[in-house]
Amino acid sequence: ETIRDLAFGGVSTEDIIYELEKEGIIRGYKAVIDWDSFDDAYVSAIVELNVVPKADLGFEEVAEKVMSYHEVESVYLMSGSYDLNVVVKGKTLQDVARFVARELATIDSVTSTTTHFVMRRYKEMDVHLCDMEHDDRGQFLL
């Protein structure tokens, strides 16, 4: 059955959610936290990895290795000028830089890394994280 069939068949929302969870379509739930409002906020970075894919395995082996680190929040295979997009978090800029240098950059198939530190989060997982106000001149105040 499709979601539409369930919804139009008079099935409750709870039953639809249960079915989606059972089938593995809903993989989990997560709270969106505005870490910038905490004193003990963490630093996050987007790390671009260039990778030489392995025969018969492609990028999978490297992606699995990268995913195994607790500092890694997300991993995406990309089209374009680099291969893997890795979202990393740490307590400080130095922690993230050290992790990239000691762990990610030393993986066998990784040929280069480029790290971009997140300066501010405006929207995450479709949730607005900051209120943007206009001043009298029509400019944004943050």
Model-derived features: positions:
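A compositional/biophysical signature of low hydrophobicity enriched in polar/charged and small residues
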Residues: 1-142
